Amino acid sequence: MKLLLILGSVIALPTFAAGGGDLDASDYTGVSFWLVTAALLASTVFFFVERDRVSAKWKTSLTVSGLVTGIAFWHYMYMRGVWIETGDSPTVFRYIDWLLTVPLLICEFYLILAAATNVAGSLFKKLLVGSLVMLVFGYMGEAGIMAAWPAFIIGCLAWVYMIYELWAGEGKSACNTASPAVQSAYNTMMYIIIFGWAIYPVGYFTGYLMGDGGSALNLNLIYNLADFVNKILFGLIIWNVAVKESSNA
């Protein structure tokens, strides 16, 4: 209860960021901002409450899942205000969010393996570097610091590198020695990295590489969908394997 009270007091602080504008029923992108904001809040409370159900070695993983959705919720409070009041894409807020949450998501792969088997710390370093390269060049392309196409290609190459490390490199080698439940969760998380994260390049392409056909509306709608899938579903997979492994302990 104390944790919930603290959490509630903290998340109540940015409510002023919601803005005073009305939400147009035909603004599906604006609606998606509000839906994702609510879902992230609910997920954050859920992950922190569920920590009490799992054994000690899984608590860190659920804490990180709660941090991912909590940080994203905080930034979505501001992003939705920017969109409703101005109709502009909240690029800076979004990349600040990703700069914090994407490395944490990558960290989850390391944590889930470390909880079940021995895994080298070098894997985390490789994934961290790959995620930062992907984000930095993605931001440079969206902010106009460098040409959109080269930034897009470099970011995608970093994403492919992370997939390789997890699917065929050190991550897969460590996963092969884990329990069936952990292996199943790991493989499901891999599919999210491959297919769920593929939604982000689609949004980037739609917003910046389609010439006159691009739009901030489509860009943000796709990005919001991607955040919903990748942040919340990712955490639910961690929660599921943590509960199963704890009950079998």
From Swiss-Prot:
Site (Primary proton donor): 108
GO MF entries: light-activated monoatomic ion channel activity; photoreceptor activity
Pfam family, one: Bac_rhodopsin
Signal peptide: 1-17
Record-annotated site: Responsible for spectral tuning: 105
Annotated positions for site Primary proton acceptor: 97
Function: Light-driven proton pump that generates photothrophic energy.
Note: It presents a fast proton release and an alkaliphilic photocycle, consistent with its marine origin and the near-surface environment where this bacterium was collected. Transport occurs only at pHs above 7 and is unidirectional. Mutagenesis experiments that removed all the Cys residues of GPR show that at least one of the Cys residues in the protein is probably modified post-translationally.
Protein name: Green-light absorbing proteorhodopsin
Upper classification of the organism: Bacteria, Pseudomonadati, Pseudomonadota, Gammaproteobacteria, environmental samples
